[in-house]
Amino acid sequence: MNSYKLLTPGPLTTTDTVKQVMLFDHCTWDDDYKQITQTIRRTLLALGHVSEPEYTAVLMQGSGTFGNESVLTSVVGADERVLVCSNGAYGVRLADICRQAGVACTEYAEAFDTVPSARKVAEYLEADPSITH
């Protein structure tokens, strides 16, 4: 039996139960895989208080950065603006993704060891009504 390794960036602990489940191959054409996928999709719609056929959920594989980039580049409209609260590499990366993709953004940056302030976020939102996200 193969002993798969889960290679992920960042500080992360993978439990033995997750590692055990990883030993089973799920193939996209198998009925159990399809059932798992459909259950996840329905659950995501329910969490958003929406339903088919007006809405759907598409599962995408990728890193956390990939997930954030997919949202920023597909959800934010041309006439909308994102407020990025940055206090580290991930926030800097999100602002850079916005700039590279042509997504309007305002960056509220704090030192890497400082928690962003809810008061300052409110001030940014009040000062700039074009911020929509």
Language model regions located:
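Conserved beta-strand segments of alpha/beta enzyme cores
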Residues: 56, 104-106
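A general structural motif
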Residues: 54, 79, 131-132
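Conserved beta-strand elements of the Class I
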Residues: 81-83
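Active-site-proximal loop->helix
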Residues: 93-104, 111, 122-124
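Active-site phosphate-binding strand-loop segment of PLP-dependent enzymes
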Residues: 115-133
